[in-house]
Amino acid sequence: MKRNLLRFGLSLIVLLVSVVTKASEITLTYSLGTITAEGTLPANATVEGGSSYTLPTNTSLYVAGSTLTGWTDGTNTYKPGETITAPSASATLTPVFTANTKSLADRTEATTLTYYFGHKNGAQDINVEKKAGILVTQATVDGESIDVKIDLDATTKGKFNNVDRKDEWAQMNADGIITIPSCKGATIEMAAYGDITKTTIDGQAEYTPGKVISQTIASSAETVNIVIGDGSYYSYLKITLPVVASKPAGKTFNNEAASVVFAMNDINNASANS
């Protein structure tokens, strides 16, 4: 009898703890609100009220001429990547975009843009197949951080996908197109799980084949295309735009250097995206 009562008591305690735990969980819902932006929202998060929660950095939303500088619940505004104390009740977070005062054209020193494709390195879900998408990173120009996007095109062929992966890799199928910022002398670097041999950059494959490749751009075009030739798992894309003086004695620069890096998820779970 005592043993049965003890078991009942323990079961009741477990039930009460479970109820209390579930009652303390809250949902943070991401919404555009009245904002019109290109891209996709971060995934909603279910967390325990009062616990630490880190807001995502912006890798998936873009407004031309502006930068995502915060997430607001209507009362408080938090910076992307900031760790906060989760509220006690569920809340909706909408993005705050601030107009840029600088652009890549204003850079007076080499700028590096790094795009990571995998969740491990901060990317949000990438699921681009039979459609177009974007990936966003930040560049620092004269002390100001600005959003810079690349375009992912798989409308007719190709695929970009890191869904359900927790590593640094994203699957890319042949014929997917990535449009990136560029200038004469820009250096493009990519990393993949397997050797890159057929992928072209601005129509050329002038690199030493390998898991990490690097190619310098000869044209003065402001954007160039990368066409995936080697279906594989990719981790990052890095673009470095050099500074090119427009006048020998002047202080104005056009098409100055900048770098961009794209990263992808772990290959250890490669079967997840087959």
Kindly label every feature range from the protein language model.
Residues 88-90, 185, 221-223:
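Extracellular Ig-like/FN3 beta-sandwich strand-entry sites
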Residues 226-233:
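Short beta-strand-plus-loop segments that form exposed binding edges in beta-rich domains
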Residues 23-102, 251, 270:
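Secondary-structure capping and domain/repeat boundary segments
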Residues 160-185, 210-214, 233-236:
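Short beta-strands within extracellular/lumenal beta-sheet-rich domains
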Residues 102-172, 252-274:
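N-terminal targeting leaders for non-cytosolic proteins
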Residues 194-207:
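Short, surface-exposed beta-strand/strand-loop-strand elements in extracellular ectodomains
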Residues 1-25:
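Sec-dependent, cleavable N-terminal signal peptides
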